[in-house]
Regions:
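Short, glycine/charged-enriched secondary-structure capping and boundary segments
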Residues: 31-32, 66-70, 120-121
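Hydrophobic/aromatic residues within transmembrane alpha-helices
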Residues: 17, 54, 66, 118-120
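Glycine-rich beta-to-alpha active-site loop
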Residues: 92-121
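Histidine-centered beta-alpha loop that forms part of the nucleotide-sugar donor binding/catalytic region
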Residues: 20, 65, 108
Length: 121
């Protein structure tokens, strides 16, 4: 499995999702949410995954939503687009909460906004 917004590996049943934008303290983008929604749905049916570790690359876990990629565009979206975005983000969190596997947030440094929400999921 390959994702553009994070590094994923599964070694001996320990699946690691490492947010991978250290220059921006692993800020979340639309692609990050889409990737998280996809990987969490896939892991639910992957018997080789026993434990999930969610962490960040560099000195920060996750600084929240990337302003130029999410916040600005969200302010310009129409209702149907906002609904799709909200469903995607809710599905990612819901998938994590419903996953029948232990999830460990290995928090390294800052965790703010939506990053704190991920940490608590």
């Amino acid at each position: 499995m390959s994702y553009s917004s994070f590094v994923f590996d599964n070694n001996d049943g320990v699946a690691t999702i490492r947010l991978n934008d250290p220059e921006r303290l692993n800020a979340l983008t639309f692609q990050t949410y889409a990737d998280l929604e996809k990987i969490t749905a896939e892991m639910a049916h992957d018997a080789t995954v026993k434990v999930v570790v969610l962490t960040g690359t560099g000195k920060g876990f996750c600084s929240g939503g990337r302003v130029d990629d999410i916040i600005g565009p969200l302010l310009k979206m129409k209702g149907d687009e906002l609904y799709k975005f909200t469903r995607m983000t809710c599905n990612a969190v819901k998938n994590m909460r419903n996953l029948k596997k232990l999830i460990i947030a290995a928090v390294n440094g800052i965790s703010a906004g939506a990053g704190a929400r991920l940490m608590l999921s």
